[in-house]
């Protein structure tokens, strides 16, 4: 597990390390440890009448024929990575994340319960909206340039110095947040996407320095576009599987 792996959404961790384990790129124990991270424990609902510990659930899911997992990070008006049915989409949208196992027709949605996490397994259709990695990576970099220029015009350093520092740090995103076996482009795209999402969360926290409602709306629009591009890039990277370019 890399130093930056804990920054991944829980569903991103599960999608990546499940795919890596299924491909033989990591051990079952390593996959379990990476997914659980700092949480107390992860249990899976819907495979048996009682909750199943994650380490056992991974094997049960593999037995269904699921070889690759894909990620969804839905937001209102953006269901990229989801394929239905509506009930699963609604649960994923409420959680803002989900894992799909296309070969088995199943999906998982996490819920934090105290210091632990439960995953609900439900029927889920394969998504045909998972972004292409090259296209999503390129789109993120183009959106970052555009958003940076717009935010600079809106005097970001004055209203949010931490955001200005974050923009500078985006020039050199560090670490490889995905498991070994994922390609260089996937690692690079995921690292940049995580930095961008962190920046957007910080900068959207308040409009304290906005001098007008128009300026505040412009900032939210620029950051919203960047967050959407970052989500798509992270979905593409985490869904690419091991040995992706």
Residue ranges of predicted features:
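Structured binding/interaction patches within domain cores
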Residues: 3, 7, 122, 161
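N-terminal intrinsically disordered, low-complexity regulatory tails that precede a folded domain
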Residues: 1-99
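Generic structural signal of hydrophobic/aromatic residues within well-ordered alpha-helices
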Residues: 31, 41, 57, 61, ...
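Internal, hydrophobic cores of structured domains that mediate oligomerization or house catalytic pockets
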Residues: 60-150
């Amino acid at each position: 597990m890399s130093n930056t792996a804990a920054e991944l959404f829980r569903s991103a961790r599960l999608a990546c390390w499940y795919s890596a384990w299924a491909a033989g790129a990591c051990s079952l124990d390593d996959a379990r440890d990476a997914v659980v991270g700092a949480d107390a424990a992860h249990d899976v609902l819907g495979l048996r009448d009682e909750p199943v510990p994650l380490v056992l659930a991974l094997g049960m899911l593999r037995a269904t024929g699921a070889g690759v997992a894909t990620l969804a990070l839905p937001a209102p008006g953006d269901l990229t990575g989801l394929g239905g049915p509506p009930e699963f989409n609604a649960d994923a949208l409420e959680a803002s994340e989900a894992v799909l196992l296309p070969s088995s027709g199943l999906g998982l949605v996490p819920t934090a319960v105290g210091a632990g996490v439960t995953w609900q397994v439900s029927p889920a259709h394969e998504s045909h909206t998972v972004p292409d990695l090259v296209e999503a990576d390129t789109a993120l970099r183009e959106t970052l340039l555009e958003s940076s220029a717009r935010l600079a015009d809106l005097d970001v350093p004055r209203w949010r110095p931490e955001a200005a520092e974050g923009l500078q740090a985006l020039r050199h995103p560090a670490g490889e947040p995905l498991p070994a076996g994922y390609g260089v482009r996937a690692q690079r795209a995921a690292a940049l996407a995580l930095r961008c999402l962190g920046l957007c969360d910080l900068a959207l926290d308040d409009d304290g320095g906005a001098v007008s409602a128009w300026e505040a709306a412009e900032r939210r629009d620029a950051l919203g576009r960047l967050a959407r591009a970052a989500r798509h890039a992270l979905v593409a990277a985490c869904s690419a599987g091991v040995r992706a370019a």
